[in-house]
A protein has these predicted regions:
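Bacterial N-terminal signal peptides
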Residues: 8-16
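Short beta-strand element of the alpha/beta-hydrolase
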Residues: 80-89
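Conserved alpha/beta-hydrolase
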Residues: 102-119
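Alpha/beta-hydrolase active-site loop
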Residues: 127-182
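Alpha/beta-hydrolase fold nucleophile elbow
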Residues: 180-194
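Gly/Ala-rich beta-loop-alpha elbow adjacent to hydrolase catalytic centers
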Residues: 193-198, 202
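The feature captures the conserved acid-bearing segment of alpha/beta-hydrolase catalytic domains
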Residues: 212-309
Length: 351
C-alpha cells in the first residue's frame, strides 16, 4: 500500500513529460492551463556569479533579487514547437500573446548593462560592441572588454532554465527544446526576440548561431559596428523588424542600415502596417507612423505591447495585434519581392 502514491506520481509524470529529441511536440496535460513560472538564475545554477564591473548583478543595491527569470506556456493552445527567448525586461502582454500563438516563452537574466560602461572610445572600434554582445550571449571569449564565463552567458542560462522548467513543469513540454542527449538547446527551434538593445544582441547572436527566426522591435542599432554585414548562420529571410518612423533610430539611419546589411531588403519593401493588412506583402521590414505626438521616446517603445503602443480611440484595443502575430508566426519561406538598396541610407558611418 505504501508504494501506491509513488506509482501514481510516476504515472502522472510520465503522462505529462516529453522525451528529448522528439520531432513534434504534443501536450499531454490532464489539466490544460496557462502556466507562468519564475526562478532565479543563481538558484538554478550554483555556478552563476555577479559581474559588478559591468552592472551584471545577482542582487540590487537594496538586496533584492536581480536575476529573476520568467517563463510561460499555455497548454490549452496547440504547440508550434518553438521557444521564444526574450532579451529584454519581462513583458507580460507580449508573453501572453506569443503563448496564444502556441509558442513557449522565456526571459533569461544576462549581461545587458555594459552598454553605458564599455566601448567608450571615440571613434569606437567597429567590432567592440558586436564582440561584447556575442560574449554576453554565448559566455565565450570574444571581447577583451569583458569577462563573461559560460554559466553567465545567455546560452547556458537559457539551457539551465529550460532544464529546470522541464522538471518543475513537465506539463509544459519544455523538454522538447532540449537536444536528444540533453546537453543543450535545440537552437533551430528558438526564436530570438528583443527590443532596442535586446533586439541588437538577438540579431548579433543569430549571425553566430542558426535559429528559427529573429524578431527585432525598434532595432537592431549599432550604427558604428560592422557585424551586420558578416556571414549569417541564420538565413537572411528569418530576420523580421518592426519600428516607428519617429524613433530616433531612423534619424541616424540606424535601422535602415542594419536591416539592409542583414539582407532584409531581399524579401520585400518597407511596409507601413497602418496602411496595409497582414501578411504585409510577406516583407520583413515593417514600420508604423501612428500619432505619438512627436515624442521620439514614445515612438521607440511603441511597437510592442504596453502603455505606449497604438490603441483604438474608441475601443482601447491594441491596433497592432496582427503585426505581432505576423512577426512571430509568418512562414519564413513566404517572402516578398526583393528591392534595391536605398542609396539615401548611409551604410558607412563614422564617429
Amino acid at each position: 500500500m505504501q508504494k501506491a502514491p509513488a506509482f501514481i506520481l510516476a504515472l502522472a509524470l510520465s503522462c505529462c513529460s516529453v522525451t528529448y529529441g522528439q520531432s513534434k511536440l504534443r501536450f499531454n496535460d490532464p489539466k490544460p492551463q496557462h502556466y507562468k513560472l519564475k526562478a532565479r538564475a543563481s538558484e538554478i545554477d550554483s555556478r552563476v556569479k555577479a559581474h559588478p564591473e559591468i552592472g551584471f548583478l545577482i542582487e540590487d543595491k537594496k538586496g533584492k533579487p536581480a536575476d529573476v527569470q520568467d517563463a510561460s506556456v499555455d497548454t490549452r493552445v496547440a504547440p508550434k514547437g518553438k521557444l521564444v527567448i526574450w532579451m529584454m525586461s519581462h513583458n507580460k502582454g507580449l508573453f501572453d500573446r506569443v503563448n496564444s500563438y502556441g509558442l513557449h516563452a522565456i526571459r533569461v537574466h544576462y549581461a545587458n548593462k555594459w552598454f553605458s560602461i564599455c566601448c567608450k572610445d571615440k571613434p569606437v572600434g567597429e567590432h567592440c560592441r558586436g564582440n561584447i554582445r556575442l560574449e554576453a550571449a554565448t559566455g565565450q571569449d570574444f571581447s577583451d572588454e569583458v569577462d563573461i564565463p559560460k554559466p553567465d552567458g545567455m546560452m547556458e542560462r537559457a539551457f539551465q532554465f529550460v532544464k529546470w522548467l522541464d522538471k518543475e513543469n513537465p506539463q509544459g513540454g519544455w523538454g522538447f527544446f532540449l537536444t536528444k542527449d540533453g546537453t543543450g538547446l535545440r537552437w533551430e527551434d528558438v526564436i530570438m526576440a528583443g527590443a532596442s538593445h535586446g533586439s541588437t544582441t538577438s540579431a548579433r547572436f543569430a549571425k553566430y548561431q542558426k535559429v528559427s527566426r529573429v524578431v527585432a522591435f525598434c532595432g537592431p542599432r549599432d550604427q558604428y559596428q560592422s557585424w551586420q554585414s558578416l556571414p549569417s548562420k541564420t538565413p537572411e529571410n528569418r530576420y523580421f523588424g518592426f519600428s516607428h518612423v519617429l524613433d530616433g533610430g531612423w534619424v541616424g539611419d540606424h535601422y535602415c542600415r542594419s536591416w539592409e546589411l542583414l539582407g532584409m531588403h531581399k524579401f520585400g519593401p518597407l511596409v507601413n502596417v497602418d496602411k496595409m493588412a497582414a501578411p504585409f506583402g510577406n516583407t520583413r521590414r515593417l514600420i508604423t507612423d501612428f500619432d505619438v505626438g512627436g515624442d521620439a521616446r514614445r515612438a521607440h517603445s511603441s511597437v510592442q505591447p504596453g502603455s505606449r503602443a497604438y490603441k483604438g480611440k474608441k475601443t482601447g484595443k491594441y491596433m497592432h495585434e496582427d503585426v505581432w502575430k505576423y512577426l512571430f508566426t509568418h512562414p519564413v519561406d513566404a517572402v516578398g519581392k526583393a528591392t534595391e538598396l536605398d542609396p539615401s541610407c548611409l551604410k558607412e558611418q563614422k564617429q
